[in-house]
Design a protein with these regions (language model features):
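Long C-terminal subdomains/extensions of small-metabolite kinases
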Residues: 1-163
Length: 163
């Protein structure tokens, strides 16, 4: 399956939030609160995955990945500054990959709100940003993916690149 995106591909808790929002909407809930979905997901429902990452041929392994969006822009999800240094208009045509990993629920909940000011990157033990022309992310189990806010279910791997 090949899909194009303008801003970002989200894999992890953001994909879960889009999936749960779609489920609630289908059940007739017209007022979807993504903040509540995220908190409830982080505390009770979403389980982090392990990931194999490839950025321009360099390989990395991560445990307990909560969030791994590949971004063309820097903002997504209602004002989160996922990749503060990302410039979608730069001549180098790089994408950025945010990796939020390695923490338990409480630490994740403590750090997560700082994403709205782009300050989550001040936690290098749990948050990394990698840049490259081609990014491949493979998780140890299928989960929901969001592409510019639209949900795609049961995805285990994705590759992002600029044409």
């Amino acid at each position: 399956m090949k899909k194009r995106f303008l801003n970002g591909i989200g894999y992890g808790i953001d994909g879960y939030c889009c999936e749960e929002g779609d489920r609630q909407r289908a059940a007739g809930n017209k007022k979807i609160n993504y903040t509540n979905i995220a908190i409830n997901g982080l505390l009770f429902k979403y389980k982090p995955t392990n990931a194999e990452i490839e950025v321009d041929g360099q390989h990395y392994s991560y445990k307990k990945v909560w969030l791994a969006p590949s971004m063309n822009g820097r903002y997504y999800g209602g004002g989160m500054i996922a990749t503060p240094a990302q410039d979608r208009l730069s001549k180098d045509r790089l994408l950025s990959l945010l990796l939020f990993h390695g923490s338990g629920k409480i630490v994740t909940l403590a750090i997560f709100p700082s994403i709205f000011k782009g300050k989550h990157i001040d936690h290098p033990k749990n948050v990394e940003v990698k840049t490259g022309h081609r990014i491949k992310v493979t998780f140890d189990r299928p989960v929901a993916l969001q592409i510019d806010g639209e949900t795609v279910l049961n995805v285990k791997t994705y590759t992002a690149y600029k044409e």
